[in-house]
Design a protein with these regions (language model features):
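Hydrophobic/aromatic-rich alpha-helical bundle segments in the mid-to-C-terminal region
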Residues: 114-119, 135-175
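Amphipathic alpha-helical segments used for helix-helix packing
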Residues: 90-116
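Generic hydrophobic, amphipathic alpha-helix propensity
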Residues: 3-11, 28, 53-57, 61
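Hydrophobic/aromatic residues within well-ordered alpha-helical segments
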Residues: 46, 53, 57-61, 75, ...
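Helix-turn-helix
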Residues: 6, 10, 14-48
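Short, solvent-exposed amphipathic helices
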Residues: 67, 113-128
């Protein structure tokens, strides 16, 4: 792994665990075992590093979700797999909440690039869900996103490891109604 990617991975872990504003460049440098010169060779600022972290995480999550659902032919089952993907994430040892939700919270100005990436991630996930819903139920996509967001918070804040499963049961009730 090259140094730039190593810095990104360390920063991702730190931002995920502590948030964006709390983690300083000095901590990233220390944990990554690199010099300030090396850090700034790859990233002009902490803001640039945050953007890179979010962009890579967006690609990673989208790719992982796509791989999870790609072999299933039934859209309803694919939708269930979206919730299953979240269940697996919530129950992983590295789960500490959503980097995109943290970005939207810590960078509340919608013109900030970190906030825009968070909005793009949410829009992309909504597009996936909308695509999987029957034409007559496309209006439910934002509601299913809310269920997933609520499940994410329940898993993070309350430690509810079954939050995604509960959200799927509610989603099923809405879709099959």
């Amino acid at each position: 792994m090259n140094k730039k990617q190593h810095i990104i991975e360390i920063a991702t872990e730190l931002f995920n665990q502590y948030g964006y504003h709390v983690v300083g460049v000095d901590l990233i440098i220390k944990e990554a075992g690199v010099s300030k010169k090396t850090m700034y060779r790859y990233f002009q600022s902490k803001a640039n590093l945050i953007i890179e972290v979010l962009q890579q995480r967006q690609i990673l999550c989208a790719t992982s979700l796509k791989q999870k659902i790609q072999h299933e032919v039934d859209n309803f089952k694919k939708l269930e797999l979206v919730f299953e993907w979240h269940d697996e994430w919530f129950n992983s040892t590295t789960f500490t909440g959503c980097l995109f939700a943290k970005a939207a919270t810590e960078f509340p100005n919608k013109s900030e690039e970190a906030h825009q990436i968070a909005m793009q991630q949410k829009s992309s996930l909504m597009a996936v869900i909308e695509q999987l819903l029957p034409h007559t139920h496309k209006h439910l996509a934002p509601i299913l996103i809310m269920l997933l967001d609520g499940a994410t918070l329940s898993a993070q804040v309350l430690g509810d490891k079954k939050a995604a499963i509960k959200a799927w049961k509610t989603a099923q009730n809405l879709i099959l109604k």
